[in-house]
Amino acid sequence: MQEPVPEPVQEFTKVESIFVRHRNCLMIRAEFTPIFTDYYLHLMDIEERHPENLDTTLKDLLAILTLHLTARPWAETIAWTANIRGPRLNFFATGSSVHEYITGRLFTEDVREPDRNFLYSQTTTQGKEPRTSTIEVETSDPLEWLRHFYDQSEQRPGRAYKLPNDTYVLIAAQPDFDQEWFEGLNIEQVAKISDEEEPKTRATRRFKFACG
């Protein structure tokens, strides 16, 4: 009996921007296996390996920033740096919607230890001065960083969810959103939004991991 041929891994991650009608929320969704595969190939090329917990944090950051880029206006380049104390670490990620790439790196040496954990954001648009913001974060979880970032810098609620199979989802509130529905969401409900709500795809982008 002939063995089934496995499907090839895509070279890019397809990111969908979906409007959830009647809830007035934007859902950004993607399966990040292609980006994570290229990320690991890059680590092999530079002969670098991270402890599993730090590796997971950096991958989460790459995914979360990609979703955020897709939720933002198209012509932006965004960089996030998380400066974490105890142990002293810097998680860095940057990406561009124009060129549809994401990249990132973990720094463990010569890192300044802050008195608190901070997330630094810089947004660049061609022909304009960069916009920067700094927020304090309480944990080393990028999904929590995004929540605080949206509350403080975006001035609208945003929540990120990590689903099975390298799938991540960002739910970003729009004007007149259904607050009760938004605040009651859990992972199981987020996974069923496309089946139980009225989604309308607005845009699709294709992101790749850039080696830098």
Predicted regions and their residues:
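Interaction interfaces in information-processing and related assembly proteins
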Residues: E3-G212
